[in-house]
Design a protein with these regions (language model features):
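Terminal amphipathic helices with adjacent charged low-complexity linkers/tails
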Residues: 157, 161-207, 211, 389-391, ...
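Metal-dependent DNA phosphodiester-chemistry modules and their immediately adjacent helices/loops
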Residues: 192-213, 217-229, 489-518, 522-523
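C-terminal, non-catalytic interaction/recognition modules in large multi-subunit enzymes and RNPs
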Residues: 11, 141-145, 149, 280, ...
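N-terminal glycine/serine-rich phosphate-binding loop of ATP-dependent small-molecule kinases
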Residues: 1-83, 129, 136-158, 172-177, ...
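Conserved phosphate-binding loops in N-terminal lobes of ATP-dependent enzymes
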Residues: 17-19, 28, 32-36, 41, ...
Length: 660
């Protein structure tokens, strides 16, 4: 086993990306994703990249994996047969959801269906209050009466979500003990473990989602681990989480819901490291793959994080129309605009792109695998942006004729456009959609865009980055080496980490550091034990945050908490930090209002070495073209002959005169 060979694999909707770092030398590969058996694509990518580096699986010291399997399982509703056990009177909280409508003007609004149907939402009598005081002891006979029902319904997995279990988990644990004794093969999720936070709907939804995907994810992880071992790998396997850290397979088996947005998190980490290398304070990360595009604001090299995420939105990108999850996640906006997104003309004669995707099977029309829809990739091929012979490292041969035929049928004939203009129109629409998403995201975060640098990666982002930067008023674009597998490269820079969250209501006017210090000690011990199991002996760092708001508000903002023993004076420190954060977001503070804290979070992670800073770029000769081909020029709205340059031939300081 080598100490320097590290491998990462990112499964996307269209391609599975592999990155291998051997002593600082990077080897990459892309293979088509195999949706029916994702591990097949993983193994194909691994077998393709190892010989390039001249090593075997036995030489690997580290493997990290990110996957969309959990997300797809929820969206496609292909998870386990799941039941929910809830406090009597509260089993419908997961279906009632929020009191407000995400679209108040649509009288035919469709809410996302719960993962657990009503006949499998089973009540038990018990009750705790918000402070954890037991008002009604658990009626254990109610739990035992559920056993034959669970057997009869052939339930594979159960979510246990009792009212106020975040404050006292005694009843949830007792329910689990009774069920485990009677049904030892049953998968059990406790809401007090996966989401020990206030807010009943989100906690229940998160627990149900974890239970829904757990059997499938556990089976997949066990199978993948066995396949890697059979290939000769002897090193540990880590999973990328949605919060931007790595975790062990065992932890991922218990909390698979934390893997939901693992792929995009790797891209944000890559962009953050590039920002630090280049000395950039503010950047916009732009990751466009085969199925979706992700946009993330990064300040001081650190992506913004959140505790909320929605999956399976019923209305295109409408907040509130999906299933809410309370998990650590990197804050980003995601739209269904990838290389495989299908373009069509709607009833009003407008070009719409996505969210439907051709995926990897059958793929865009130019793949020649039976796909007939006109996709963004087909438009890029028709515009001369993609070499038909060099796509995915030459592993996929493209057909420009099939691209043009699909565009003619879907767009050109319906809008009376010639072929190139139809392709250009598709490209313009997808770039405008992404630019609008970036603008809205920046406004929601109280951030500006014009002064930022755009970092573009993913299989499709570099093709659209310059036009998108122009629309956003940005004057610098960075396309890193290995951009096509950017998320997989980002995995290799991620720390081993774990986040612990606790809901503990506190008012700053009555700040109690003793109780908080005890809570933080317990949280630290829990997180450190998990991180140490994956990185024994490694130096660790700790970060604490509080979710704060003015009394009476319905949303919180994140404030850093000193990672040390708190004292009474820290109440004033937190108040000042909150006022500053609130003013940055909303343009003012409200000094007369009292501040409260609902939730506290602590993360422990290994310390990633800082990336080397880029020194002054030396002057170099002009780059030499390897050839030329026809390229559609947006300003001329016509084709021009443009030089072609190989990315590997470009060295720091070289210049290229466009269009190229």
């Amino acid at each position: 086993m080598s100490d320097t060979a590290r491998l990462s694999v990112d499964i996307g909707g269209t391609f599975t990306d592999v990155a291998l770092d051997v002593g600082g030398r990077m080897f990459t590969n892309k293979v088509l994703t195999t949706p029916q058996a994702p591990e097949e694509g993983v193994m194909a990518g691994v077998r393709a990249v190892l010989p390039e580096a001249g090593i075997t699986a036995a030489d690997l010291a580290f493997i990290v994996h990110g996957t969309t399997l959990a997300t797809n399982t929820i969206i496609e509703r292909k998870g386990a047969h799941t039941a929910l056990i809830a406090t009597d009177g509260f089993r419908d909280a997961v279906e009632m959801g929020y009191e407000h409508r995400f679209d108040q003007y649509d009288i035919n609004i469709e809410k996302p269906a719960p993962l657990v149907p009503r006949y499998l939402r089973l009540p038990v009598r018990e009750r705790c209050n918000a402070t954890g005081e037991i008002l009604l002891p658990l009626v254990e006979d109610d739990v035992r009466a559920l056993v034959p029902i669970l057997r009869e319904q052939q339930i594979e997995s159960v979510a246990i979500t009792l009212i106020h279990a975040y404050a006292n988990d005694k009843h949830e644990r007792r329910v689990a003990e009774i069920l485990q004794a009677e049904l030892p093969e049953l998968w059990i999720t406790l809401s007090s473990e996966v989401c020990p936070e206030i807010r009943e709907y989100e906690r229940t939804s998160t627990a149900c989602a974890n239970a829904y995907v757990q059997p499938l994810m556990a089976s997949y992880l066990a199978d993948l681990d066995a396949r890697l071992r059979a290939e000769g790998a002897q090193c540990p396997l880590f999973m990328m989480t949605s919060g931007g850290g790595l975790t062990t397979v065992e932890t991922a088996r218990r909390h698979p819901i934390r893997l939901v947005e693992s792929g995009p998190a790797g891209g944000a980490i890559l962009a953050g490291r590039i920002a630090l290398e280049c000395g950039l304070d503010k950047v916009l990360s732009y990751d466009m793959g085969g199925t979706t595009a992700k946009i993330c604001l990064i300040d001081e090299g650190r992506p913004q994080t959140s505790r909320t995420f929605e999956v399976d939105r019923q209305y295109r990108f409408t907040k509130g129309s999906g299933l809410p999850l309370r998990i650590p996640v990197i804050e980003m906006v995601e739209i269904g605009a990838g290389g495989g997104s299908i373009a069509q003309v709607d009833n009003l004669g407008r070009i719409q792109v996505g969210p439907e995707s051709a995926g990897s099977e059958p793929g865009p029309a130019c793949y020649g695998q039976g796909g007939t829809g006109a996709t963004v990739t087909d438009a890029d091929v028709a515009l001369g942006r993609i070499s038909p012979d060099g796509f995915a490292g030459g592993s996929v041969q493209l057909s420009p004729e099939l691209s043009q035929a699909a565009l003619d049928k879907a767009i050109a004939q319906k809008l009376n456009l010639d072929g190139p203009l139809a392709a250009f129109a598709v490209s313009e629409m997808v770039e405008e959609n992404m630019s609008n998403a970036a603008r809205v995201h920046a406004v929601e975060q109280g951030k500006e865009l014009a002064a930022r640098t755009l970092i573009a990666f993913g299989g499709a982002a570099p093709l659209h980055a310059c036009r998108m930067a122009e629309k956003l008023g940005m004057d610098r674009v960075i396309i890193p080496t290995g951009a096509g597998v950017g998320s997989a490269i980002g995995f290799l820079a991620a720390p081993v980490s774990y986040d612990v969250v606790r809901s503990r209501y506190s008012r700053l006017a009555h700040f109690e550091p003793e109780g908080l210090n005890k809570m933080f000690t317990e949280m630290h011990d829990e997180a450190q034990a998990i991180v140490a199991s994956g990185a024994p002996g490694a130096a660790l760092e700790e970060r604490r945050i509080a979710y704060m708001r003015y009394i009476g508000q319905g949303h919180e903002i994140v404030v850093e908490v000193p990672a040390r023993a708190l004292v009474e004076a820290d109440g004033a420190v937190l108040r000042a930090a909150y006022d500053e954060a609130y003013e940055a977001l909303f343009g003012r503070e409200i000094a007369s209002m009292e501040v409260e804290i609902l939730t506290w979070a602590l993360s422990v992670s290994t310390i990633a070495p800082p990336p080397p800073r880029q020194t002054d770029i030396p002057e170099a000769a002009a780059a030499s073209a390897s050839g030329e081909r026809k390229l559609f020029d947006a300003d001329l709205t016509d084709f021009v002959m443009a030089p072609v340059y190989q990315r590997d031939d470009l060295t720091p300081g070289m210049t290229v005169q466009g269009p190229a």
